[in-house]
């Protein structure tokens, strides 16, 4: 806590002194300071918030001679403003009134109850349903010479309580951050580690927070264990230091202990198939190259019925296990779901899954005592639905170990369900302050207060009838006004019949008003019944939250089971709908895909041409040639995606598929520069190629697309040749190598493990038809000029290119210079006639002729014929203006 000198408060009002003390403890955070129905921001915070949120900046009064700049947001809409700020990477301290304004002397007592940061979100309104939010801390380990030897990572999903550790090599940081995708990264003050751009909001915290000894102890305390040996984390000193800082920061933002963080998983890079940032991007797993969410592999696979299943799918896609046993277990479960009997049909199961709430996140909010009434009712209804869900899969659990494990975890926590059923109303209000949250029959005092509040009118009617009968006064009335409260009114002629227990409350000209002990007691209750009922309900709700805390481990157990079942059912639905098959696995080196299809592209087109792909010990590199737009990149990507889907545990789009071990997938596809990093397109390409050449193993799958672009023709060809040779001779990995350098098709003559395949095209009519079929052997041309013509390049440019192509081919055949002279004029002998032997590039048909072919003169009326004549003239003039002959 920051301590300010008395001089800092001189001249400030008591309220502003309170604000300044709070702000001093959160200097880099926007402070939302509660004042009545608004959260106010002051001074620099107000200016910043007004700019970011488009709020009105006002100026009211002065403090210490300085005008007070203010901006505010209504408390009932605060979440939408928090969501905007967090999306911008800002953090917000929520400062609430905790004192009673009626009894406070001076400013009402206030304190920061939580700090909302990009990596510590738990509120449903601030979270994306289908994305996990991670807070990550990183701590660099050094040797005795001060050289960085590793980076310890600790990351936490606060919404679920999942905590993970890992230690990586320093050069693996970018890949790790791309895989984890943290929303917020904690680093020590003074650290020099470069965090890649776009990796997440960065936050500096004191270096002592990363102390290894205290971090290890804090981690043990959090997990309630004596040592970390049981988690395999005892030797991960850097990661333990990061975990200590992470837990300290997360607890501080919540203002309380993290009761739901009770488990730990240590991740090892050898546990998953390696996917570097370029591969995740090029394969468009969860985001397209344009930055959109669809169409991607994730968007195709995500037919999950629960948000938990959707989030688990994202995790599985970014963490494909290397061990095929995990994939086989999942595929066994998919097969069981597809073959289930009618009473356990896939459709019936998915219908039951739609009744399951987001137990994972509700449990997180419950642990932080921030669960709302409808969270608890959703939890209750989910637990009540679990027996029916178990009944759906009961008939098939014996056919799949994964389903048996899920079934066991789906057992509802009976005591927790009983408490929720008895305590929470069937359809509670959204907020406790609105009342109607606690169920009737749970608390006698609350029921009485509600009865008084709700049945006030009936009580008065009953009392009036009883008093008339008791006194014999026929016109006696029981009434109420705001000044005198409840009273019994008796006309002046009947006052002699008034019983002794009547006490005069007011005298009127023609009547007397009385109060009785019974009516006084009722009045005391009735006038404060609603207020007291709300206060009682708030206290009861808080006690229910406390009573539910011991059930958090059981709730977490239940949360994981529907997510996995939902995802397996989604995989089964996709397999059934899209005609996918179960892959097989072998310990032998090789990949065999028969009639494979690109899962995402197939869903976007009417007809997709399936292709085979085969690798083995005698066939390690496929040299792919063929025309532009012929489908080379699609074929390469589909091979990688089918392999990844198989190891994730999904069925795959193919007639059959068999995979040997795969440890990593690399891609060198597409062209993109790195202007911020000062790297050209060619430099980026070579950097990615270097990573592949240095790291690929005989079990790696490598996609190389047109390596060598961006430099001179001969330089590019030489590099492509040398890289292909190195991949064959040294890496011996599975390689798909697409190229337009036809000279490389001679490679199989030197290396029998290389094979030529091509995607063919044929010229037809006035254009070119891409067959998209992969055939053995090399292609004979690239059809680049035909593709340019299809793209709309003007005809004069196409004709000039065709003429110059013939000249360049002639020059290349007759000269042995290291560079072709692209800018010398073709000799006069090389005219258009000499291009006759080149592949025909028919001129685009005249649009007027095309229009005339479609006309039936016998059907034209005179006016239509005249209009058509004008249209034809316009087409001719437009065509001539474009430079056509």
From Swiss-Prot:
Coiled-coil boundaries: none
Top-rank taxon, per record: Bacteria
Cellular compartments per GO CC: cytosol
Residues binding ATP, per UniProt: 626-633
Transmembrane segments annotated in the record for this chain: none
Annotated keywords: ATP-binding, DNA damage, DNA repair, DNA-binding, Nucleotide-binding
GO process annotations (BP): mismatch repair
InterPro entries: DNA_mismatch_repair_MutS, DNA_mismatch_repair_MutS-lik_N, DNA_mismatch_repair_MutS/MSH, DNA_mismatch_repair_MutS_C, DNA_mismatch_repair_MutS_clamp, DNA_mismatch_repair_MutS_core, DNA_mismatch_repair_MutS_N, DNA_mismatch_repair_MutS_sf
Lipid metabolism listed as a keyword: no
SUPFAM superfamilies: DNA repair protein MutS, domain I (SSF55271), DNA repair protein MutS, domain II (SSF53150), DNA repair protein MutS, domain III (SSF48334), P-loop containing nucleoside triphosphate hydrolases (SSF52540)
Molecular function terms from GO: ATP binding; ATP-dependent DNA damage sensor activity; damaged DNA binding; mismatched DNA binding
SMART domains on file: MUTSac, MUTSd
Task performed by this protein: This protein is involved in the repair of mismatches in DNA. It is possible that it carries out the mismatch recognition step. This protein has a weak ATPase activity.
Protein family according to the UniProt entry: Belongs to the DNA mismatch repair MutS family.
Entry protein name: DNA mismatch repair protein MutS
Organism: Burkholderia orbicola (strain AU 1054)
Upper lineage: Bacteria, Pseudomonadati, Pseudomonadota, Betaproteobacteria, Burkholderiales
């Amino acid at each position: 806590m920051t301590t300010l000198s008395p001089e800092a408060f001189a001249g400030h009002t008591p309220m502003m002194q309170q604000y300044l003390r709070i702000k001093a403890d959160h200097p880099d955070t926007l402070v939302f300071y509660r004042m009545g129905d608004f959260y106010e921001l002051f001074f620099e915070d107000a200016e910043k918030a007004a700019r970011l949120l488009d709020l009105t900046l006002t100026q009211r009064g002065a403090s210490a001679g300085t005008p007070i700049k203010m901006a505010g947001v209504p408390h009932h809409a605060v979440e939408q403003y928090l969501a905007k700020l967090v999306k911008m990477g800002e953090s917000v301290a929520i400062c609430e009134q905790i004192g009673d304004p009626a009894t406070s002397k001076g400013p009402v007592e206030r304190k920061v109850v939580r700090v909302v940061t990009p990596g510590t979100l738990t509120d449903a309104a601030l979270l994306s349903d289908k994305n996990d939010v991670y807070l990550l801390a990183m701590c660099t380990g050094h040797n005795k010479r001060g050289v960085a030897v590793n980076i310890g990572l600790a990351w936490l999903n606060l919404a679920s309580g999942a905590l993970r550790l890992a230690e990586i090599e320093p050069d693996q940081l970018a890949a790790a951050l791309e895989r984890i995708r943290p929303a917020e990264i904690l680093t020590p003050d003074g650290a020099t580690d470069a965090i890649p751009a776009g990796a997440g909001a960065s936050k500096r915290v004191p270096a002592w927070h990363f102390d290894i000894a205290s971090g290890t102890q804090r981690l043990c305390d959090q997990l309630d264990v004596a040592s970390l040996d049981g988690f395999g984390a005892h030797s991960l000193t850097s990661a333990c230091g990061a975990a200590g800082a992470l837990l300290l920061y997360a607890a501080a933002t919540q203002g309380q202990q993290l009761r739901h963080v009770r488990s730990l998983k240590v991740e090892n890079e050898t546990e998953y198939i390696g996917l570097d940032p370029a591969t995740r991007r090029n394969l468009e797993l969860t985001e397209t190259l344009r930055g959109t969410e669809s169409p991607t592999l994730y968007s195709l696979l995500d037919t999950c019925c629960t948000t938990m299943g959707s989030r688990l799918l994202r995790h599985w896609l970014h963490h494909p296990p290397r061990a095929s046993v995990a994939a086989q277990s999942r595929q066994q479960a998919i097969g069981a779901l597809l073959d289930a009997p009618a009473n356990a049909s896939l459709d019936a199961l998915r219908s039951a899954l739609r009744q399951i709430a987001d137990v994972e996140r509700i449990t997180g909010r419950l642990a932080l005592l921030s669960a709302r009434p409808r969270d608890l009712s959703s939890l209750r209804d989910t637990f009540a639905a679990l027996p029916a869900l178990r009944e759906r899969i009961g008939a098939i659990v014996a056919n799949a170990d994964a389903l048996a494990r899920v079934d066991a975890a789906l057992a509802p926590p009976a005591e927790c369900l009983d408490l929720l059923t008895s305590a929470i109303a069937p359809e509670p209000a959204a907020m406790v302050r609105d009342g109607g949250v606690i169920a009737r029959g749970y608390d006698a005092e609350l029921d009485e207060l509600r009865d008084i509040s709700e049945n006030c009118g009936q009580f008065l009617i009953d009392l009036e009838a009883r008093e008339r009968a008791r006194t014999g006064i026929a016109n006696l009335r029981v009434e109420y006004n705001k000044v005198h409260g409840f009273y019994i009114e008796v006309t002046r002629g009947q006052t002699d019949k008034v019983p002794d227990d009547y006490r005069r409350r007011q005298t009127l000209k023609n009547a007397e008003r009385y109060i009785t002990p019974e009516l006084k007691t009722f009045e005391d209750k009735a006038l404060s019944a609603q207020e007291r009922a709300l206060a009682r309900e708030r206290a009861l709700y808080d006690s229910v939250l406390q009573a539910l805390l011991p059930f958090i481990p059981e709730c977490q157990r239940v949360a994981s089971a529907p997510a996995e079942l939902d995802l397996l059912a989604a995989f089964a639905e996709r397999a059934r709908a899209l005609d996918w098959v179960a892959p097989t696995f072998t310990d032998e080196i090789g990949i065999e895909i028969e009639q494979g299809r690109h899962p995402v592209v197939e869903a976007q087109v009417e007809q997709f041409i399936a292709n085979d792909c085969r690798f083995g010990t005698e066939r390690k590199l496929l040299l792919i040639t063929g025309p532009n737009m012929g489908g080379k990149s699609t074929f390469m990507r589909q091979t990688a995606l089918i392999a990844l889907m198989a190891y994730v545990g999904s069925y795959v789009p193919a007639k059959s598929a068999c995979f040997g071990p795969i440890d990593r997938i690399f891609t060198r596809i597409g062209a993109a520069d790195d202007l911020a990093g000062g790297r050209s397109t060619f430099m980026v390409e070579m950097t990615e190629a270097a990573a592949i050449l240095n790291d690929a193993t005989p079990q790696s799958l490598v996609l190389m697309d047109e390596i060598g672009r961006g430099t001179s023709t001969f330089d590019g060809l030489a590099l492509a040749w040398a890289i292909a040779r190195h991949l064959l001779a040294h890496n011996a990995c599975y390689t798909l190598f697409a190229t337009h350098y036809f000279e490389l098709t001679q490679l199989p003559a030197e290396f029998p493990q290389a094979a030529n395949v091509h995607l063919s095209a044929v010229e037809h009519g006035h254009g070119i038809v891409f067959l998209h079929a992969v055939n053995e052997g090399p292609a004979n041309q690239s059809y680049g000029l035909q593709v340019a013509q299809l793209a709309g390049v003007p005809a004069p440019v196409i004709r000039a290119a065709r003429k110059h192509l013939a000249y360049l081919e002639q020059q290349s055949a007759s000269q042995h210079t290291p560079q072709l002279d692209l800018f010398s004029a073709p000799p006069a002998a090389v005219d258009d006639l000499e291009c006759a032997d080149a592949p025909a590039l028919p001129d685009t048909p005249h649009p007027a002729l095309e229009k005339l072919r479609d006309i039936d003169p016998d059907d034209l009326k005179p006016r239509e014929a005249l209009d058509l004549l004008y249209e034809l003239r316009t087409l001719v003039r437009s065509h001539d203006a474009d430079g056509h002959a």
